[in-house]
């Protein structure tokens, strides 16, 4: 019994041309895809190298300060006041309290101003709002020593060195970060919520307080924390507004010590114990700034995910 084998007919002229074009397009697409994958891989490698090179100085700084400063930490370091030169056993309790007072007062001064200015910027448009944004951007780029000199000329010359003059200088330093951060946070609130609140008959002030501000609280907290992290480590404004003291003081009208002062003065001392105190103060300051920055960035990341 014989079997016949059926063979597929050869493609005609048009079909052959179509098949050839399809094979050509598929080959070109595969080559393009391979090239794009190679480019994407190269870009990822370059970005990874850049990120690694960026993290090297940070890791070296954190490791070096930790190595030099962690040995100074003790109960006495956090509870005692500084001792005279050459006498070991001193601490930075007055500097810790002074930094909390100065930066806390600066935060109290800058927070309402930054919030009100940000509310004005999201409600008003025009040359005045643009000028305020431009001024905030310029102020954020000014060297902190100029802000300290400004506070010295306006406050210290007419009064005396004090904690409140240092707080005013740091508040000016924090303001541009708060203004721009608060504005961006409140812009994440949808316009529909504004319109819904006004349509219900609520006053604009009530809508702002109950809808806009309440809806942007995570972003406002982030902006304030990042501004505080900027002000905590500044030394130049303090040099013009208050003076280093070994006394424990909580008066806003008197000179008050701060952690940057301890780092600046003890770090340049010829005595080893004071140098060790400076490294310990640097470690405490570094940890504090890192904690504030991490908390602020975490809030910012959550706000971004929520807005999406």
Please tell me what each predicted stretch does.
Residues 137-173:
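Generic hydrophobic transmembrane alpha-helix motif, especially the helices
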Residues 1-51, 296-308:
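Transmembrane alpha-helical segments of polytopic membrane transport and secretion proteins
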Residues 106-136, 149, 296-305:
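Transmembrane-helix boundary motif in ABC transporter permease subunits
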Residues 107, 181-182, 204-241:
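Transmembrane alpha-helices
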Residues 85-86, 238-287:
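Interhelical loop and adjacent transmembrane-helix boundary motif
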Residues 26-49, 63-106, 262-276:
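Periplasmic/extracellular loop-to-transmembrane helix junction in inner-membrane transport proteins
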Residues 183-187, 222-225, 265-308:
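C-terminal transmembrane helix and the adjacent membrane-cytosol boundary/short C-terminal tail
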């Amino acid at each position: 019994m014989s079997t016949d084998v059926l063979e597929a007919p050869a493609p005609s002229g048009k079909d052959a041309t179509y098949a050839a074009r399809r094979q050509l397009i598929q080959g070109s697409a595969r080559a393009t895809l391979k090239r794009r994958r190679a480019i994407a891989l190269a870009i990822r490698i370059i970005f990874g190298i850049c990120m690694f090179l960026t993290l090297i100085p940070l890791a070296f700084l954190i490791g070096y300060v930790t190595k030099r400063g962690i040995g100074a930490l003790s109960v006495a370091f956090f509870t005692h006041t500084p001792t005279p030169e050459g006498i070991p056993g001193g601490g930075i309790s007055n500097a810790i309290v002074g930094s909390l007072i100065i930066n806390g007062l600066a935060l109290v001064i800058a927070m309402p101003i930054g919030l009100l200015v940000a509310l004005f910027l999201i409600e008003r448009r025009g040359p005045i709002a643009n000028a305020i944004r431009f001024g905030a951007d310029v102020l954020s780029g000014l060297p902190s020593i100029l802000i300290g000199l400004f506070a010295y000329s306006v406050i210290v010359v007419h009064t005396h060195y004090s904690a409140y003059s240092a707080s005013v200088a740091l508040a000016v330093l924090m303001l541009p970060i708060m203004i721009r951060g608060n504005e961006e946070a409140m812009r994440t609130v949808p316009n529909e919520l504004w319109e819904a609140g006004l349509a219900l008959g609520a006053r604009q002030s009530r809508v702002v307080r109950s809808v806009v501000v309440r809806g942007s609280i995570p972003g406002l907290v982030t902006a304030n924390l990042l501004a505080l992290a900027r002000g905590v480590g500044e030394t130049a404004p303090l040099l013009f507004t208050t003076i280093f003291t070994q006394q424990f003081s909580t008066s806003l009208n008197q000179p008050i010590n701060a952690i940057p002062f301890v780092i600046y003065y003890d770090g340049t001392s010829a005595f080893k114990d004071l140098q060790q105190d400076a490294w310990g103060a640097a470690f405490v300051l570094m940890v504090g700034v890192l904690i504030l920055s991490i908390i602020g960035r975490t809030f910012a990341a959550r706000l971004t995910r929520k807005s999406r």
